[in-house]
Amino acid sequence: MTTTSISARGLWAVLAVFFCAPAAADLRSAEDAYTRHDFTKAFHDFQELAELGQPMAQLDLAIMYARGEGARQSDIYAYAWASLAADNGSEKAKALADKLRPGLAPGSEKIAADIRGEFGNAELDARLNPRIVEDAEHEDRSRCHPVHVYMPKYPEEAASRGIQGGVYAEFSVMPDGRTRNPRIVYAFPSGTFEAAVRQSLLHSEYSEAKPGSAPIQCTQFYNFTWGASADQYPKLQSFVRETLKNAEGGDPQSQAVYGMLLVGLPQLNAPRSKAIPWFLKAAQGGVPTAQYQIGFGLLKGWGCNCEENKGLDWLRRAAQSGQPDAEVTLAMYALKGHPDEERFRQAKLWLEQAAASGSHDGKLYLSALLATTPAANGGDSKRAMSLLDEVYRGVKDDPTVHEIRAAAQANMGDFKAAVNTEREAIHKAGALKWDMTPLNERLAAYTSGQPWTGTLLIF
């Protein structure tokens, strides 16, 4: 992953703080609930995080059991959770466990051991946590280094108002050395810089690979600051140190940001395997985007061994908190291979949820699904084009908009329009130096009066 500066009229980019979306249960919400004496919610949230292996939540849950707050008082459960937190390095938890142990009734330690066995590190490693390996970077990371970076204009409204911010994007680099449909994982402030980043990635060039090679997963950190100069670099170093300090202090959001900095800044240039422990800590702390990062990494073997069942578990947790990237990923996973009616229904449901939240990718992938599915099977070409207009309003040079529109037109039986639209997609793709093979295949289908029902978008 690289850091890209956006320059326009004397503007260039430096690091900005990214904020994590709130989870259904996270340390902050649990602590706030406890402060308000809402012990029922605090207990529920601490328990959810404690069962993921979060040591601070395990200690707080132990304290609540010992005091009978939010649940029936139980020294056995208090001892069990304090012991788990102690196993994870908490000195306060060890002191509490040592205090409780002499007062336990005979046989109580066996009950506590059963709880520890279910939620101890060994069990979580086997059932949920990624297996981090240094050589898990199977892909050629050099392909993520741009040959040419396209610098879009600084957004005019942001410039006129002096707005600063940043975007963290993940994307696939195809064998032709160009990107497709980047996923904007973080954007702050929302709705300001995303379009500029998509334009940059659409027109940037990367190293080509042999035809038929698999796409490679890459990430890029875009930072927008008004009126900054090169002497701001020490502030970047200071920000990294401060973020690490907060991350080491147990703040889940700082842990997520530091994970991004590790793989995002050329100055740190760490492999994904070094960021995974920080993403995991943040995920255990209830940060949905970190849960998505862990889940996606497990699906792809990105920084860890590929373990799909674990990945799907984390993705579902993130999706249940409304994390749109997780929802889209679950949808695309359901559509792998030859999906049956139930898998199609699941995929459509996840995409509907992502689209309803306003997610760009939710609307994009839903429009592609509706455009390439026969009406009898749940497709809806008119709605596909309506969603497309929302996603690509004002965008003129991305072939994807024409690809989806052509598929929708063909699905409605208007093959003449589909052929013309697909030719426009091919014209724009040629200007971007895309591999034309899949586009020409679709053009041939429309020319022969056949709709396209295969996968349209690379994820």
Model features per residue range: what roles?
Residues 26-33, 60-67, 98-100, 257-265, ...:
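Hydrophobic face of amphipathic alpha-helices that form TPR/SEL1-like repeat modules
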Residues 38-41, 72-80, 233-238, 268-278, ...:
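Structural signature of tandem alpha-helical TPR/SEL1-like repeats
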Residues 27-54, 296, 300, 332, ...:
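Alpha-helical adaptor scaffolds
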Residues 99-144, 378-379, 404, 411-413, ...:
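Terminal, low-structured helical/coil segments at or just beyond the last alpha-helical repeat
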Residues 126-170, 196-241:
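Short proline/glycine- and basic residue-enriched helix-capping loop/turn segments at helix->loop/beta transitions
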Residues 174, 178-210:
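A short, well-structured alpha-helical segment
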Residues 37-38, 51-55, 67-69, 74, ...:
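Short helix-capping/linker turns of helical repeat alpha-solenoids
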